[in-house]
A protein has these predicted regions:
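A hydrophobic, small-residue-rich beta->alpha segment in the mid-to-C-terminal subdomain
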Residues: 49-102
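Glycine-rich anion/phosphate-binding loop at the beta-strand->alpha-helix junction
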Residues: 1-49, 82, 89, 96-97, ...
Length: 136
């Protein structure tokens, strides 16, 4: 489907297979390439019913990230941060202004792709902060 001839297979588990992975990639992948290696990788996507999101999200043990992608770089950043604010409101109990203020003070922006027709930005923040504010 792209320059690596990725093969997609679908089953009842809805998995997709990719023959290449990035060993590393600089922010933006500015010349269009990363260090890639052949691999057989299978991942599974879970569908959460009645939980709408506008843009992709990533969640790890130490951070959360919302991803925005569009032609203007600053708009991609706005999309990522807007989605992150919605996420903080819905899942972490933040008020909109408080989430916006905290991201202004603690948030990070990652440039994922700068060479395709659309730029990809990730807005992220440390989950440690939320655990301090909203202990379980």
């Amino acid at each position: 489907m792209d320059r690596h001839n990725d093969k997609f297979t679908y089953s009842s588990r809805r998995s997709a297979e990719y023959p290449y992975a990035h060993a590393c990639q600089g922010d933006g992948e500015v010349c269009g390439v990363a260090v890639e290696y052949p691999t057989f990788t299978t991942f599974t996507v879970n569908v959460i019913k009645n939980h709408d999101i506008e843009w992709p999200r990533l969640e790890a043990d130490d951070f959360i990230m919302a991803i925005g992608s569009t032609r203007l770089l600053e708009d991609a950043c706005r999309i990522a941060y807007r989605e992150l604010i919605y996420w903080l409101e819905r899942n972490f109990g933040f008020e909109c202004y408080d989430a916006y203020t905290m991201l202004s003070q603690c948030g990070k922006v990652r440039l994922g792709n700068f060479v395709d027709p659309k730029y990809t930005m990730g807005g992220c923040d440390s989950q440690k902060i939320y655990r301090l504010i909203f202990p379980a």
